[in-house]
Amino acid sequence: MARANPRRRATAAKDKWKMKEWFVVYAPDFFGSKEIGLTPADEPEKVIGRVVETTLKDLTGDFTKGHVKLYFQVYDVKGQNAYTKFKGHTLARSYIRSLVRRRTTRVDGIFNITTKDGYKLRVMGMVIAYRRIQTSQERAIRRIIQDIIYKKAEELNFADFVLQSVNGQIASEIAKEARKIYPIKRAEIRKIKVLAEPEA
């Protein structure tokens, strides 16, 4: 079987790369429609579906938010512009590790919720208590995480729920209530995943 000439293969690959265009990727409206990256493709259709990762620091300029990772998926391309929708967020593992030290208790809660405008999300909340706590206290704190997340989902539309999650507002409410049970170090919404969008 004849083998392709390595030089020809390299030239073909180079030519294919030259044919690609760069598309500017934008965040959704509720994140200010800011530019979040560039992506290459030889056809606009190939850009659709791509997921772009950025941080809240890059979007807002707030250097304290570098640990908040955001994921956006391209759903539409017009000209050289690619438009995205929010797919989820997570906190950097190194940040979470920095919170969880010896003699602390990590309380997690994972909940499937529906926002006021019909988006189905999986939301993961987390509270770090300063010391080892009793099982009853752990249950009480987990219930607080659950109650506040469900309450916010009933009150807020998708965009506002996401914004209040990633900027720490919902976590602040959780922390305020959890401190009535036991002194805590930190509360966070550590992850959101979009499960389903409302039917058009």
Swiss-Prot record:
S-S bridge residues: none
Keywords: Ribonucleoprotein, Ribosomal protein
Single GO molecular function: structural constituent of ribosome
One Pfam family in the UniProt entry: Ribosomal_S3Ae
GO biological process: translation
A GO term from the CC aspect: ribonucleoprotein complex
InterPro entries, alphabetized: Ribosomal_eS1, Ribosomal_eS1_arc, Ribosomal_eS1_CS
Family membership: Belongs to the eukaryotic ribosomal protein eS1 family.
Name of this protein: Small ribosomal subunit protein eS1
